Regions:
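Accessory beta-strand-rich segments of carbohydrate-active enzymes
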Residues: 48-51, 98, 117-236, 263-264, ...
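An acidic-aromatic loop/edge-strand motif
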Residues: 99-104, 108-118, 169-170, 180, ...
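Substrate-binding/catalytic cleft of secreted carbohydrate-active enzymes
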Residues: 402-580, 612, 616, 630-631, ...
């Protein structure tokens, strides 16, 4: 957890009356926790407006009959609510999703670019209604309701009165606040009702592109928290702390600001007092009736905001993500009118173009190589805090430092947690829908785009984890739109770099983007990343790319593919691939069959798929690591999936890590020894900021039958944040077609700090560059011959376990001793931690290592930590299997 310091601000004012009901745009409730606040997460009911004949004035009155309505929670979408209450069957199982009402939209283009199909129940608006008791303590207060996420447009009613019209209340990423004071009934029942319409094809909504099917309601609903707040006459909004580091990156100056809104009909005079480490500063404030004023504390005026020894926020891979907290108070005498809290970090992010034109980022004066993945929320945008915790813990466990958000700019919980965990976030608009169809924009579209940009900039500017904003995705906006976005960012005092798009396309306004999105997205062999010099290879900053499909582990496949469709691969499998060009796993499967030999069963296919995923992800991240800072960043497409998927993830929908997860984890070791597929060299990549002297690299080559053919050891020093070549791997005599390479890195004291294991072929993968047609993938001319792996003798490992799980503990640990007693390689050893009650992995689970290989006679201890709540009070079952490993349960050590 991060450390914190508290800054307090107090504003004194006179008590006055409140104005009539009005909507305030761009006032994020989540950024200002008021003195009195309730969240309306429960008590919601929804129904199609085609089924409700009553007008909004009646729907929003207490006692309105809602028999037959669907109960739900918020955040949610219409389809999400109908799935939750079992109106619809599990859409993630088999092909249930495509049988939902409204799924008859065309597959020729993205659903976001289509009108709702005829007969869809989601052509109608849907009512979202909540009847709740307003706290008695809210009496005499200024009461507001906050909607930071409505998809897409809404008529809003409260206690029988319309307070918002769909002509104004529209935009997935806009933030709305309504003053309810004159209509609210403190201590009694109140009703809020929204008549929500799904986004049309010209609306700036959200789309799932080709990741997975788009739900038939286009995620219509309330997708962020709804809160009701009570305050005095003056409201505090948009608190912001901006830091400026001195060139020594030790001292820092802070500027604290907030918008003060006088909701009364009388002038308010007061003073703002700020405290920092026992020091206080003060300035007078006067607000005319209805006035909003930005109050600022500048360090030149208030020396208390000049910190000589600032504690900096760092990405967790570099240092501690230290967080400060500022508390703002507005008081009338001894009575608090409103409060606000803002958590922030002191850090400075800059970017520049290298001599080759590639964008490189620095934080607090240190360059860093971006190694990240793209995150996806739940398909129905439901809040899943435990799953989010697991997602972010997995990010850190693998060694990734960045998460990208293409649209779906999530709830504040997401950014609060990335701040605390020191994980960088790269948000921006989405591609492939109205967001990039600028030629079709109307004045209203432009207004929504501008308001969305302003709201999100104000919301995210305090979060130290957010280090850049992409205001274009697959391409940059035209000059007039780009200038509009840049003006809005400037007005919001956006503290970080912004980039015109995720692609390499330049603009006339800002020039080169310095990034690229040149793929691939389909399967490519490990050699691709170092061999390619024109597309997705390891140079520049690749904002989205992937070695292709990622088949979930067998136990997970059984959870979403019906038993009669599990083998051979059929259309049910393909339905869980992607969209557009990614509707099958055929390219991946062809490579699997040609490199590893034809799969003979689901189990055979799955073990080979895990080996491919491990090798593919490791090769991609290792290539970008070896080439730093010719390569400046890479974003794996993707981290996770919004539903059970066969493509683009590092762990599956059920949170089970597979081969790709552990290939990534291996590649991202802080001090790492690795092999290069392009020139058969061995390098050491140092991702720390300390020089490492007196290291030794050992490389051993083994034949398929585990005979040692070559053993080489060299000394080397490794500079900080650098990659150094250690040696070349020659091909010795007697090499089998399929062979193995084991690498070890030891420090000055002889301690093993990194090891790596490769399965290679004397027949290399070769790419057919002439047949490359687009950025999706590059076809192969020849395939490596790894079929020898099928003839590896079965190995029964010696194994024992020690479990540390005290009664009542929420976190358990286990240590597993493994030994290969045979004369053969134990290849791709997989350990599982499962519940005895269910044949499912207990997740999230954090293995030191997995999908590893053991030399003949080699012994290793592997540790794991896990969440005990999945085990129903029992100890876990530890299981071992692998490519040529006899499956067994691991017994207790004696």
């Amino acid at each position: 957890m991060s450390s914190r310091i508290t800054v307090s601000l107090v504003l004194a004012a006179a008590s006055v009356f409140l104005p009539a009901v009005q909507a305030q745009e761009g006032a994020p409730a989540a950024a200002s926790a008021s003195a009195h606040s309730i969240e309306l997460s429960h008590g919601w009911e929804i129904q199609s407006s085609c089924e409700v004949k009553a007008a909004g004035a009646d729907v929003s009155k207490s006692g309105f009959a809602t028999a037959g309505w669907h109960k739900t929670t918020v955040p949610n979408t219409v389809v999400g609510a109908l799935v939750d209450d079992k109106t619809y069957p599990d859409p993630f199982y088999g092909t249930n999703m495509k049988n939902l009402p409204g799924m008859n939209y065309s597959s020729a283009t993205f659903f976001a670019n289509q009108d709702m199909p005829e007969g869809s129940p989601f052509r109608c608006a849907w009512w979202w209604r909540n009847e709740f008791v307003m706290p008695a303590a809210f009496a005499g207060k200024n009461i507001a309701i906050h909607f930071p996420g409505i998809n897409y447009r809404a008529n809003v009613w409260f206690n029988g009165q319309k307070i918002g019209d769909a002509q104004d209340i529209r935009g997935t990423y806009r933030i709305f606040e309504f003053n309810l004071t004159q209509l609210a009934k403190a201590g009694a029942k109140n009703v809020i009702a929204l008549e929500i319409t799904a986004p049309g094809k010209q609306d700036l909504g959200l789309t799932w592109v080709d990741w997975n099917p788009t739900p038939p309601d286009k995620d219509m609903g309330i997708w962020k928290e709804v809160t009701v707040t009570a305050a005095g006459p003056v409201a505090i909004r948009n608190p912001f702390v901006k830091s400026r580091l001195h060139r020594d990156f030790t001292a820092a100056d802070l500027t604290i600001s907030a918008d003060l809104r006088n909701d009364s009909k009388t002038t308010v005079k007061g003073s703002v007092v700020a405290e920092l480490d026992g020091k206080s500063v003060k300035q007078a404030v006067e607000l005319a009736a209805g006035e909003t004023k930005t109050v600022r504390f500048e360090p030149e005026q208030f020396p208390a905001l000049q910190l000589a020894q600032a504690k900096l926020w760092w990405p967790y891979t570099i240092g501690t993500p230290y967080l400060y907290k500022a508390n703002l108070h507005f008081s009338a005498g001894n009575e608090v009118s409103d409060t606000a809290t803002v958590t922030f970090g002191i850090r400075e992010v800059t970017s520049e173009l290298t001599d080759q034109g590639y964008r490189v980022f620095s934080i607090n004066g240190r360059r860093f190589l971006i190694r990240g993945a793209a995150w996806a929320p739940d398909m129905f945008l439901r809040p899943m805090s435990k799953k989010l915790d697991a997602d972010l813990r997995y990010v850190r466990h693998m060694g990734l430092n960045t998460v990208r958000l293409e649209g779906r700019i999530d709830r504040d919980e997401f950014f609060n947690k990335t701040d605390e965990l020191g994980i960088l976030v790269m948000p921006g608009w989405t591609c492939c829908d109205a967001w990039e169809q600028w030629k079709d924009w109307t004045d209203e579209t432009r207004k929504v785009a501008a308001a969305s940009m302003a709201d999100q900039a104000r919301r995210l500017r305090n979060h130290p984890s957010v280090f850049v904003w992409l205001y274009g995705s697959d391409g940059p906006p035209p000059a007039d739109v780009e200038k509009m976005y840049l003006s809005i960012l400037s007005e919001a005092e956006w503290p970080d770099p912004s980039v015109s798009s995720a692609s390499e396309a330049p603009t006339t306004v800002t020039g080169k983007s310095g990034v690229k999105m040149t793929g691939p997205y389909e399967y490519v062999p490990p050699v691709y990343w170092l061999a390619d010099k024109q597309a997705g290879g390891a140079y520049g900053y690749n904002t989205e790319t992937s070695p292709g499909p990622a088949i979930p582990v067998l136990e997970s496949v059984k959870r979403f593919i019906p038993s009669d469709h599990r083998w051979p691969i059929d259309d049910v499998w393909n339905y869980h691939a992607g969209g557009e060009r990614f509707t099958t796993v055929n390219v991946f499967t062809d490579a699997l069959n040609r490199r590893y030999g034809p799969a003979t069963s689901l189990a055979d296919y799955e073990r080979k798929a895990q080996a491919i995923a491990y090798d593919g992800e490791r090769a991609m991240f290792e290539a970008y690591g070896r080439n730093k800072y010719t390569s400046t960043g890479v974003i794996q497409w993707m981290l996770n999936n919004a539903w059970p998927s066969l493509i683009w993830h590092l762990y599956d929908y059920y949170l089970v890590p597979g081969g790709g997860y552990f290939g990534t984890k291996k590649a991202l070791e802080p001090l790492h020894v690795q092999y290069a597929y392009d020139d058969q060299s061995v390098s050491v990549v140092n991702s720390t900021y300390q020089e490492r002297k007196g290291m030794k690299v050992r490389a051993r080559v083994y034949s398929l039958d585990a005979k040692l053919l070559q053993d080489t050891e060299v000394p080397l020093d490794v500079p900080a944040d650098a990659a150094v070549k250690a040696l070349d791997v020659a091909k010795p005599d007697g090499l089998t077609t399929t062979y193995f390479l084991r690498l070890d890195l030891r420090d000055l004291r002889g301690r093993l700090v990194s090891h790596n294991f490769y399965w290679l072929s004397t027949k290399p993968d070769t790419l057919d560059w002439a047949k490359k047609q687009d950025t999706v993938y590059t076809p192969q001319a020849e395939f490596a011959d790894l079929t020898g792996l099928n003839s590896l003798p079965a190995v029964r490992l010696e194994a024992s376990r020690v479990i540390e799980q005290p009664p009542g503990a929420t976190l358990g640990k286990a240590h597993i001793r493994l030994k290969n007693p045979s004369s053969s390689m134990a290849f791709q050893v997989r350990l599982r931690l499962a519940s005895r009650k269910e044949d499912r992995d207990a997740v999230p689970v954090f293995w030191d290592d997995n999908y590893f290989s053991l030399l003949p006679g080699e012994e290793r201890i592997v540790s794991v930590s896990y969440d005990t709540s999945q085990l129903h009070g029992a100890e876990p079952v530890i299981l071992v299997d692998g490519f040529n490993i006899t499956s067994a349960e691991v017994g207790a050590a004696h």
